[in-house]
Amino acid sequence: MSVSVWPPLLLLLLLLLLWAVPTFQDKNTRVSAYKGIGEMCRNNSECQSDCCVTNSLNPQKFCTSQTVFLECVPWRKPNGFLCEENTECHSNCCIRTSSNPDRFCSSKTIFMQCISWRKPEGAICQHHLECWDLCCLPLSENSPSSHCTKRTGLLALCLPV
């Protein structure tokens, strides 16, 4: 009966290699991919998923799984949160929702448009885009200020009355 010596020797060699690899690396670098999902991280290489992102308003980053398309997508603000630009929002839509100058994350329309709040009829305006009906006209020829007005005529044009 002959006993093969190779399997134990191969196992011992493999263990020695695994033990030796970290010792050959620079002392300031860590072995990559050692943190699991949910653990704190600073960069992608620390995570087994190769994905280190913020997952809340807290600036601390955590290891998270990648998307089906192998993308590493950070957490984005849900609707109703204050924002400054579209990329901060999950809906990719950061708009004014009232006369208040603050902007909030908001859902897009059924046609995937991001439409901001507009001034109602009668409100003082400086440009057509400020008004709900996209029509900003002076009340009279001598009027120093313009107001939001309804569009008129068969073709609903922005014409002075």
Curated annotation (Swiss-Prot):
GO molecular function: enzyme activator activity
Key word Signal present: yes
Matching InterPro entries: Colipase
One GO BP annotation of this record: lipid catabolic process
Keywords, ordered alphabetically: Signal
A UniProt-annotated Pfam family: Colipase-like
Gene3D superfamilies, per database record: 4.10.40.50
Signal peptide residue numbers: 1-25
GO annotation, cellular component aspect: extracellular region
Name the UniProt record assigns to this protein: Leucine-rich colipase-like protein 1
Record organism: Mus musculus
